UniProtKB/Swiss-Prot annotation:
Organism: Homo sapiens
Protein name as annotated: CKLF-like MARVEL transmembrane domain-containing protein 3
Family in the record: Belongs to the chemokine-like factor family.
Lineage: Eukaryota, Metazoa, Chordata, Craniata, Vertebrata
Subcellular location: Membrane
PROSITE patterns registered for this protein in UniProt: MARVEL (PS51225)
Pfam family, one: MARVEL
Domain of life: Eukaryota
Region annotation Disordered: where it falls in the sequence: 1-21
Keyword Hydrolase: no
Length: 182
């Protein structure tokens, strides 16, 4: 989320008191930390990627296969942001405006899913198209929730910055008014 959360707590020790052997190298190193996956942002990104994948599979099996590109792209983008947030790439790559990219991704995904879901349900009669439309509506809700939360976090962050600027400007104004009264 924005501003970036501090480092998540490491996984707690097992009940036995000590860890059994060294960490397993390989693919497990690529998996996001459990603390991130249990956070609200992690859950939203998991839901976005899961619903996008299910919607993609439904569109592949349906007669509305013209719509399969949008869920595939959203699935890949959700996976990218999942791993980027989990690996804290937003801290490493400061040149990119991560909250704005995530916000725009969620807004466009919600709008596109809403439009293609309405079309899939209204225009096509097969069951896979109807299922894709229903999963698309669920994905619309998840993406809309995500962009609402991102917007609130960014607005809160900007409001904190504005209040600090106002305080500095107010102090400067008081100092200037004190010097004029002498």
């Amino acid at each position: 989320m924005w501003p970036p959360d501090p480092d998540p707590d490491p996984d707690p020790e097992p009940a036995g008191g000590s860890r059994p052997g060294p960490a397993v190298p390989g693919l497990r190193a690529l998996l996001p930390a459990r603390a991130f996956l249990c956070s609200l942002k992690g859950r939203l990104l998991l839901a976005e990627s899961g619903l996008s994948f299910i919607t993609f599979i439904c569109y592949v099996a349906s007669s509305a296969s013209a719509f399969l590109t949008a869920p595939l792209l959203e699935f890949l983008l959700a996976l990218y942001f999942l791993f980027a947030d989990a690996m804290q790439l937003n801290d490493k790559w400061q040149g990119l405006c991560w909250p704005m990219m995530d916000f725009l991704r969620c807004v466009t995904a919600a709008l596109i899913y809403f439009a293609i879901s309405i079309t899939a349900i209204a225009k096509y009669s097969d069951g896979a198209s109807k299922a894709a439309g229903v999963f698309g509506f669920f994905a619309t809700i998840v993406f809309a929730t995500d962009f609402y939360l991102i917007f609130n976090d960014v607005a809160k962050f900007l409001k904190q910055g504005d209040s600090a600027d106002e305080t500095t400007a107010h102090k400067t104004e008081e100092e200037n008014s004190d010097s004029d009264s002498d």
